[in-house]
């Protein structure tokens, strides 16, 4: 069967979000938005091994963060995704040990719940090579405790649904200053403005 022709500017998905206003709205993302953000993530995660990574699919895929940084990035690298219908800390650590998970995308609460899991010491989590965190700020104490527990530094990032979603991330290898949202993704322009939208110096 021949595949249909798809224009890069055509609508690919509608992501619903409350955004910064709290008023629900559907963000229209094109095929270009989705593919480019996935490729930016692939470039950023240059230490990913094509066809040899195992992702923990614990973040919901109906959310732009889960869809792009877990599902799409896994598909782009030919990786296996271990799906969890809903997040439960002990089920997550069991899955990491059983399937030798190497990549985990999560939100701060997930990492915190894993740290606080009463049975976490029973499981070997050292297969994890990369942890990505988004959706809300990562507390420094959670970052430090998770690193002590697994030996892996969480790479915190920033994005918004309207951007498709990721715009910034800390380097996968290198400095991870606590509280930093990282550096702009490739070909991403960033600026600081005040409430009157005047550009400010960095």
Question: Predicted segment positions?
Answer:
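Conserved adenylate-forming
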Residues: 2-9, 14-57, 77-79, 122
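Conserved AMP-binding
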Residues: 58-63, 136
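Alpha-helix capping/helix-boundary segments
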Residues: 88, 109-111, 138
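Conserved beta-loop-beta connector loops within the AMP-binding
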Residues: 191-202
């Amino acid at each position: 069967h021949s595949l249909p022709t798809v224009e890069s500017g055509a609508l690919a998905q509608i992501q619903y979000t409350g955004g910064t206003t709290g008023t629900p709205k559907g963000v229209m993302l094109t095929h270009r938005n989705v593919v480019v953000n996935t490729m930016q993530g692939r470039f950023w995660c240059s230490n990913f091994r094509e066809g040899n990574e195992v992702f923990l699919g614990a973040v919901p895929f109906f959310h732009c963060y889960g869809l792009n940084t877990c599902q799409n990035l896994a598909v782009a690298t030919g990786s296996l995704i271990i799906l969890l219908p809903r997040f439960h800390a002990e089920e997550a650590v069991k899955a990491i040990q059983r399937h030798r998970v190497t990549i985990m995308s999560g939100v701060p609460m997930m990492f915190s719940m894993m740290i606080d899991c009463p049975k976490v010491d029973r499981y070997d989590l050292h297969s994890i090579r990369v942890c990505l965190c988004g959706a809300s700020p990562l507390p420094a104490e959670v970052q430090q405790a998770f690193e002590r527990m697994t030996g892996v530094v969480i790479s915190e990032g920033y994005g918004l649904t309207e951007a498709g979603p990721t715009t910034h991330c800390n380097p996968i290898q290198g400095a991870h200053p606590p509280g930093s949202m990282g550096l702009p993704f490739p070909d991403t322009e960033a600026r600081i403005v005040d409430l009157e939208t005047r550009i400010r110096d960095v």
